[in-house]
Curated annotation (Swiss-Prot):
Record-stated family: Belongs to the succinate/malate CoA ligase beta subunit family.
The name this protein goes by in its record: Succinate--CoA ligase [ADP-forming] subunit beta
Keywords assigned by UniProt, alphabetized: ATP-binding, Ligase, Magnesium, Metal-binding, Nucleotide-binding, Tricarboxylic acid cycle
GO cellular component, one term: cytosol
Subunit (UniProt): Heterotetramer of two alpha and two beta subunits.
Listed cofactors: Mg(2+)
PROSITE patterns: ATP_GRASP, SUCCINYL_COA_LIG_3
Gene3D superfamilies linked to this entry: ATP-grasp fold, A domain, ATP-grasp fold, B domain, Succinyl-CoA synthetase domains
UniProt source species: Mycolicibacterium gilvum (strain PYR-GCK)
Pathway connected to this protein: Carbohydrate metabolism; tricarboxylic acid cycle; succinate from succinyl-CoA (ligase route): step 1/1
A single GO BP: tricarboxylic acid cycle
Species classification: Bacteria, Bacillati, Actinomycetota, Actinomycetes, Mycobacteriales
Gene that produces this protein: sucC
Signal peptide: none
Span of domain ATP-grasp: 9-236
Binding residues annotated for ATP, in chain numbering: K45, G52, R53, G54, S94, E99
Length: 387
């Protein structure tokens, strides 16, 4: 889960990472009130989960509360790379002597943690990596040893930070490591990490991605969910513990196992080329369980997608046999009743496939069409979606 900047800074404050005071708002009047309360020049910053805010006009300096009001009016509703600004962070402006970069992330290719640090902050880090690779330090972090003050200082030194700020930077870097580990993050990034004229180190921006797999032990992270921005179907699927991702297509997909579902997406997309260009409408993996309740929840999510014209259920029976899947489909259709109003193409294969097909045939539901193979099932689903 990606956080907004103001949410990242809430975590920073929790772990004593120094930053500038400010508050989030969704109105220009409130932005003016916050600026008045701060009593100093402020930055008015669009809260969107995408980079390039400054270039898009989403970050403005306000010398007075009236300036904050004007900038807030202009920024609210702004479209930044497809993200409409609904919230603003009004934070105290800071004098900047130098800008640095620091991040912690997962290095999946090397199966370790990685610290990245550079004296060249305030610009896109990809640009630094491309044009000044010697100015960007990439330091592997031992998961067991972690980051103590000495190692944090070493990271700062390798990033070419000036000697006079190494100690102060090390303290902040260690605290950012604490955010990374204690909050179960997969990314913690500060760009820029600034040095003020009086040699303070401040995190002026923050980007944090939290690992959703750790939600069970991070109760406090629920408050960070942006339900307004989350697709309602994805929210509904999450509430029912379904692995669902909405796509822009017409054929709903249900499968068991991520690999099979991904293959199904490809086959449906290929079949759709000869049926009006229809595409997969979603990724939905029901995993190893195909009970009536799980199947009903999955179908309920997909059938509530107005773009869906047909559904392709593609299941390979393993631990969960095909007869159990077939019974789940039949019972799910009974549970949904009139809500089940779009054709279902069902392809079963694997453990107890003959019995599964017999159950579906005897049920003789008017919406269910059986397919022998994945290719024929994808073709039929694409054909039905194009009618």
């Amino acid at each position: 889960m990606d956080l907004f900047e103001y949410q990242a800074k809430e975590l920073f404050a929790k772990h004593n990472v120094p930053t500038t005071p400010g508050r989030v708002t969704d109105s220009a009047e409130d932005a003016k009130a916050i600026a008045t309360e701060i009593g100093k020049p402020v930055m008015v910053k669009a809260q969107v989960k995408v980079g390039g805010r400054g270039k898009a006009g989403g970050v403005k300096y306000a010398a007075t509360p009236d300036d904050a009001f004007t900038h807030a009016q202009n920024i609210l509703g702004l479209d930044i790379k497809g993200h409409v600004v609904k919230k603003l962070l009004v934070a105290e402006a800071s004098d900047i002597a130098e800008e640095y970069y620091i991040s912690f992330l997962l290095d999946r290719s090397n199966r370790t943690y990685l610290a990245m640090c550079s004296v060249e902050g305030g610009m896109e880090i990809e640009e630094v990596a491309a044009t000044k690779p010697d100015r960007l330090a990439k330091v592997p972090v031992n998961a067991v040893k972690g980051v103590d003050l000495a190692f944090a200082r070493e990271i700062a030194e390798k990033g070419h930070l000036p000697a006079e700020v190494l100690d102060a930077a090390a303290v902040t870097i260690q605290k950012l490591w604490e955010v990374f580990t204690k909050e179960d993050a997969t990314l913690v990034e500060v760009n820029p990490l600034v040095r003020t004229p009086d040699d303070q180190i401040l995190a002026l921006d923050g980007k944090v991605t939290l690992d959703a797999n750790a939600d069970f032990r991070q109760e406090g992270h629920k408050e960070f969910e942006d339900k307004d921005a989350t697709d309602p179907l994805e929210l509904k699927a999450k509430e029912n513990d379904l692995n669902y991702v909405k796509l822009d297509g017409e054929v709903g997909i249900i499968g068991n196992g991520a690999g099979l579902v991904m293959s199904t997406l490809d086959v449906v997309a290929y079949a759709g080329e000869k049926h009006g260009g229809v595409k997969p409408a979603n990724f939905l993996d029901i995993g190893g369980g195909a009970s009536a309740e799980v199947m009903a929840n999955g179908l309920d999510v997909i059938l509530n997608d107005s773009q869906v014209k047909s559904v392709f259920v593609n299941v390979f029976g393993g631990i969960t046999s095909c007869d159990a899947v077939a019974n789940g489909i039949v019972k799910a259709l009974e549970i949904l009743g009139d809500e089940a109003n779009k054709p279902l193409v069902v392809r079963l294969d694997g453990n107890n496939v003959d019995e599964g097909r017999r159950i579906l045939a005897e049920a003789n539901h008017p919406l269910v069409v059986q397919a022998e193979t994945m290719d024929s099932g994808a073709d039929k689903a694409a054909e039905l979606a194009n009618k």
